[in-house]
Amino acid sequence: MGNHQADKKFTWVIKNYNSLGSGSVYSDTFKAGRCKWRLLAFPKGNNIYDYFFLYICVPNSESLPSGWRRRAKVSFTMVNQIPGGLSQQREAVYWFDEKDTTHGFESMFLLSEIQSSDKGFLVNGEVKIVAEVDVLEVIGELDVPEEPERIDINGFQVPASQVESMNSLFEKYRGFASKIFPKNQHLRKTFLDVVLSMTEILCKFPEELSSGDLAEAYSALRFVTKAGFKLDWLEKKLKETGKSRLQEIEEDLKDLKVKCADMDALLDFLR
């Protein structure tokens, strides 16, 4: 089965139609109106009605809170794949809840119309359906949490809560991100989150930081500098903080070496 999603629309391509049996088939889960949905079809009808049955359902409804409800306008289009051909559409408004998680049409389309070679609904063994879901009302919890607002700061998508911190970094350390090489926004976001987190850690008082915190900050610093960030001030801050804890770090390292030696001895004994 092929699937494609864009905004409120979801395209479902049912492949190898002729080899399908009389049972049901499901599409992948998709999102519309911050809710999850799934299509259910009986492509060959049943033993009584010679129609293509098509439904939309709420997947994993048992995980939603008691009393949930949602109302949606649903449109199904059986796509005519011949250029200029007339597609067939059905639409309705439904309430979905704990008792009624599935709605649709038992007579979406005559099987004889689909199976006819000159009608354009079955091409190369594929039937194409477009579902459009407009969520009108939701009672209870949404499936998809709302993502926090992000604002563009010098080419970086920054959460609204961190705009002030990011502006401060660019004002104090101009050009610190001018040579970053990843162009993908997801990668840039990941690197930026690491820089902001590391900045917050190193702004704490030295006595508030453990050796583990410093080790993580060092690893993070190496990670982001390899991506092109120029973070001289963070490197300086890490060195200053680390030197004030040098004796403690040496003691921790000594303990680790003793533990490693003990583990090596245990392995030798077990072998």
Swiss-Prot record:
InterPro entries: MATH-CC_domain_protein, MATH/TRAF_dom, TRAF-like. Residues 230-271 form a coiled coil. Residues 7-133 form the MATH domain. The keyword Coiled coil applies. Pfam families: MATH_2. Signal peptide: none annotated. Keywords: Coiled coil. This is MATH domain and coiled-coil domain-containing protein At3g27040. It comes from Arabidopsis thaliana. The lineage of its organism: Eukaryota, Viridiplantae, Streptophyta, Embryophyta, Tracheophyta.
